[in-house]
Amino acid sequence: RDAGVNALAPGELLRAIRIPADRLRRRTAFRRISLSPMGRTGALAIGTLTPGGGLDLTVSGGVRRPVRIAFPTLPTPQEAAQAVDAAIPAETWFDDLHGAPAWRRAVTLDFAAEIAAELGEPAE
């Protein structure tokens, strides 16, 4: 589905979201950027380590809908960036006053690499 489209019928309400407790205990890394300090998100990436040592990486903000990439093992920073680049077609990036597609793509690829590197370090 594209932005602004959901599965709710007219008059239906979302009353609850259930998140398994084990998901809330995972190690995470988060990156967000906008063109102004309090501006609309230009790019956003969230990574979580899976119990089996993999990485779930979700990209949002700069694309028409969230994109989730599941790595069975922790990727290198370069592998994470390459996987994001391969998973998101050029026409999927937003092109508006909050950021050009090339900028959104570039910072998102940097975020993917940073997240893989951060989560690859030992926990404090």
Identify the residue ranges that each predicted region occupies.
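C-terminal structural segment of proteins
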Residues: R1-E124
